[in-house]
């Protein structure tokens, strides 16, 4: 028998997608912008999120 796969950490983009599914696009965009504001750089995930809105 095979062992089940190990639990994986949720990536940043997966986390944003989950927020988008749970709370909606506006909340996901604000969550993403706050993250980029805190780390002082624009990441690919921010650009993808802003383009989807």
Swiss-Prot record:
Transmembrane region(s): 24-40
A GO CC annotation given for this chain: plasma membrane
Function: Confers resistance to heavy metal ions (e.g. aluminium) by chelating them at the plasma membrane of root cells, thus stopping their entry and reducing their accumulation. Binds to and confers tolerance to aluminium (Al).
Its membrane topology: Single-pass membrane protein
Entry's family note: Belongs to the CYSTM1 family.
Organism: Oryza sativa subsp. japonica (Rice)
Induction: Accumulates in roots upon aluminium (Al) exposure in an STAR3/ART1-dependent manner (at protein level). Up-regulated in shoot tissues in response to cadmium (CdCl(2)).
Superkingdom of the organism of origin: Eukaryota
Pfam families, per database record: CYSTM (PF12734)
UniProt name for this protein: Protein CADMIUM TOLERANCE 3
Disulfide bond entries: none
GO MF terms, alphabetically ordered: metal ion binding; metal ion sequestering activity
Gene Ontology BP term (one): response to aluminum ion
Location in the cell: Cell membrane
